Amino acid sequence: MGFGTFVRVERRERGFGLNEFARRLDISPAYWSRIEREVEKPPKDELIERAADLLGIGRDDMFIEARRFPPDMKNDVVTAIRAYRRAKEVDG
């Protein structure tokens, strides 16, 4: 299941219509419909966070569905990758 399908299921389970949901996010219903139909890629981080809050879903869970690292983890991941590569170089 892709991000759009996941969000559509969650939105419907919580009783939000597409127009109401988009209005609360301050975006066009047409744009959100394209996201839910997987025509558009998942939106920018800020919109993912706002949608998660509106749906009562953990932000980390929404980013996982979008196949992204949560913004607060990005630096940690980069640091971990660099440390791993340095350790591999030392070990040869």
Give names to the regions the model predicted:
Residues 1-13:
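A short, Lys/Arg-rich alpha-helix, primarily the initiator
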Residues 15-34:
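Short alpha-helical DNA-recognition segment
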Residues 11, 22, 52:
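The alpha-helix within a helix-turn-helix
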Residues 61-92:
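Short, charged recognition helix plus adjacent turn
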Residues 36, 47, 66:
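DNA major-groove recognition helix of helix-turn-helix
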Residues 26, 44-61:
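DNA major-groove recognition helix of helix-turn-helix/homeodomain DNA-binding modules
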Residues 8, 19, 49:
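Residues within the helices of the helix-turn-helix
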